[in-house]
């Protein structure tokens, strides 16, 4: 709770300074299910939390207009020890790296900012970009939402059931992303929730095809 309140307070302060415009139509908050990300064992060097964690915040154009990546050459400035760094390590865990290495080198955060965050400039600078992603994550408790609809870790459900459960809180279509495990079973890997550039309302996501939505398959929510 304290970290969430801190993120909200920092968001209000820094966003009051420079509300300018970036050239994108919407942005997708991509949340990873750590149990699927860290399978098979040995892939992660952090204990996977039993909740969704941030992969990234991806600005983009509407369908048929292309995907935005590496929009500027702006450098990533490492976060120094303090409240923002602690919040990032809680909400945006660098699962592939030991904590000390992640905090020192910040590889995931650097990669996401260079690839996607630069496309939010000048509307959102680096600090605003990361604070915004964490604030948007706090808007939705997807794990509780899924559980409310009987979708619990270790069970399989259709694409439509998972999508409809998430729509009860987003009101707009989310983007489900899947991976196929070594047994050939589709697993829920990530959930994308889309927002307008101002982040003041939801936006229908462009749909990935990794979950084979037209076939409405059974998808494993890994325990």
From Swiss-Prot:
PROSITE patterns, alphabetized: RNASE_T2_1, RNASE_T2_2
Glycan-modified residues: 51
Molecular function in Gene Ontology: ribonuclease T2 activity; RNA binding; RNA endonuclease activity
Primary localisation category: secreted
Alphabetical list of InterPro entries matching this protein: Ribonuclease_T2_eukaryotic, RNase_T2-like, RNase_T2-like_sf, RNase_T2_His_AS_1, RNase_T2_His_AS_2
Annotated localization: Secreted, Extracellular space
SS bond list: 38-44, 71-119, 178-211, 194-205
Keywords assigned: Disulfide bond, Endonuclease, Glycoprotein, Hydrolase, Lyase, Nuclease, Secreted, Signal
Superkingdom as given in the UniProt entry: Eukaryota
Reaction it catalyzes: a ribonucleotidyl-ribonucleotide-RNA + H2O = a 3'-end 3'-phospho-ribonucleotide-RNA + a 5'-end dephospho-ribonucleoside-RNA + H(+)
Binding site for RNA: 55, 94-95, 115-116
Enzyme class name: lyase
Reported tissue expression: Pistil.
The keyword Nuclease belongs to this UniProt entry's keyword annotation: yes
Active-site residues from the entry: 55, 112, 116
GO BP terms: RNA catabolic process
EC number of this enzyme: 4.6.1.19
Annotated signal peptide: 1-22
A Pfam family this chain is assigned to: Ribonuclease_T2
CDD domains to which the protein is assigned, alphabetical: RNase_T2_euk
GO cellular component: extracellular region
UniProt entry tagged with the keyword DNA damage: no
Family stated for the protein in its record: Belongs to the RNase T2 family.
Function description: Self-incompatibility (SI) is the inherited ability of a flowering plant to prevent self-fertilization by discriminating between self and non-self pollen during pollination. In many species of the Solanaceae, self-incompatibility is controlled by the single, multiallelic locus S. This stylar glycoprotein is associated with expression of self-incompatibility in potato.
Name of the protein in question: Ribonuclease S-2
Origin species: Solanum tuberosum
